[in-house]
């Protein structure tokens, strides 16, 4: 269900720190997305490239869960009247957590049928709290073969290539910046030989601001043919592309499971997400997993305006994107 829109004024939302601009293949950015055609996302589900829309406007959480499929701790979820700038009045989804092992958050997981065999874009809004030790957050994108009706990340193990992959972007609690968290058959082990999600940006200035709404968009492009390393993964914050990796770009330096984008480094090898055509993009996973806070701590994480499409979506607003403030201290990383 979408919101009624009577009047809408785009409110600029700035990324909260200096950004690194990644110069890669030409890709839509800022005002070029399909959201420009649907102010406030009203009616965006009618666009032919849109696969799924969730605006959390049902009468109850119980009415939302069936549209997704699998849910963890739905009884702990709530609606909030706090919505992003550019949104018509309505609801966002609040996933709270309570420290000391009482409640570590919750999730909504959706299987995409049919699966996507080329490129997918997922845009959503998230409001991180001002404090708290959240671990995994946002919306992860991935594939499973065979299709799984519930999350099965198999944390700490490298995919074989015909079984699964994960492409994610989240505010990272290890390096305290917004970061990739990716599992694929070509991922690198950490210094101990273990396989945890690879960090692929490593720039402390790239932040999803705490206590404010952030528009996040991800693009995942599968490798075709399955023998190629031409898969890609890109991230936008508030309409600004902050990372884009693919075959031969950007340059950077590997250290264990971390790739730091740096023009003095070697070209990124590209993603071979899969080795079998039966594996495609077939799930999204909205989650707040926050198990590490002490007894007595409680906080909330808000989500809104989820759109899944096969073309770039862009942020909310009368022009289809929130206009970010001009960042400073830019560093240009050129692809070759």
List the predicted regions and their residue ranges.
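N-terminal secretory signal peptides that target proteins for export/translocation
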Residues: 1-10
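Positively charged, low-complexity intrinsically disordered regions
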Residues: 4, 73, 165, 332-335
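Bacterial N-terminal signal peptides
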Residues: 9-24
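Low-complexity, Ser/Thr/Pro/Gly-rich disordered linker/stalk regions
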Residues: 28-214, 218-319
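Low-complexity, Pro/Thr/Ser/Gly/Ala-rich linker/spacer regions in secreted
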Residues: 29, 313-329, 333-336
């Amino acid at each position: 269900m979408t919101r009624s829109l009577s009047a809408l004024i785009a409110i600029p939302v700035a990324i909260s720190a200096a950004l690194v601009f990644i110069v890669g293949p030409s890709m839509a950015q800022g005002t070029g997305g399909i959201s420009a055609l649907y102010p406030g996302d009203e009616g965006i589900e009618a666009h032919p490239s849109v696969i799924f829309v969730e605006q959390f406007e049902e009468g109850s959480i119980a009415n939302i869960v069936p549209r997704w499929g699998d849910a963890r701790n739905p009884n702990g979820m709530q609606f909030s009247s706090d919505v992003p700038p550019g949104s018509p009045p309505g609801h966002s989804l609040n996933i709270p957590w309570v420290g000391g092992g009482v409640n570590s958050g919750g999730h909504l997981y959706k299987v995409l049928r049919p699966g996507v065999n080329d490129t997918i874009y997922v845009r959503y809004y998230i409001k991180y709290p001002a404090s708290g030790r959240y671990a995994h957050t946002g919306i992860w994108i991935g594939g499973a073969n065979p299709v799984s009706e519930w999350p099965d990340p198999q944390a700490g193990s490298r995919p074989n290539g015909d079984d699964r992959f994960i492409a994610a972007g989240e505010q990272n609690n290890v390096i305290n910046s917004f970061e990739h968290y990716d599992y694929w058959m070509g991922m690198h082990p950490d210094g101990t030989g273990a396989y945890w999600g690879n960090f692929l940006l490593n720039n402390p200035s790239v932040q999803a601001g705490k206590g404010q709404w952030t528009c996040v968009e991800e693009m995942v492009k599968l490798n075709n043919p399955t023998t190629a390393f031409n898969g890609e993964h890109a991230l936008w914050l508030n309409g600004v592309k902050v990372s884009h990796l693919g075959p031969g770009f950007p340059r950077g330096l590997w250290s264990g499971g971390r790739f730091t984008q740096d023009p003095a480094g070697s070209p990124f090898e590209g993603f071979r997400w899969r080795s079998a055509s039966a594996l495609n993009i077939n799930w999204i996973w909205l989650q707040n997993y926050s198990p590490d806070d002490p007894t007595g701590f409680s906080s909330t994480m808000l989500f809104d305006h989820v759109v899944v499409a096969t073309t770039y979506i862009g942020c909310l607003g009368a022009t289809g994107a929130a206009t970010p403030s001009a960042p400073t201290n830019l560093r240009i990383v050129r692809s070759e």
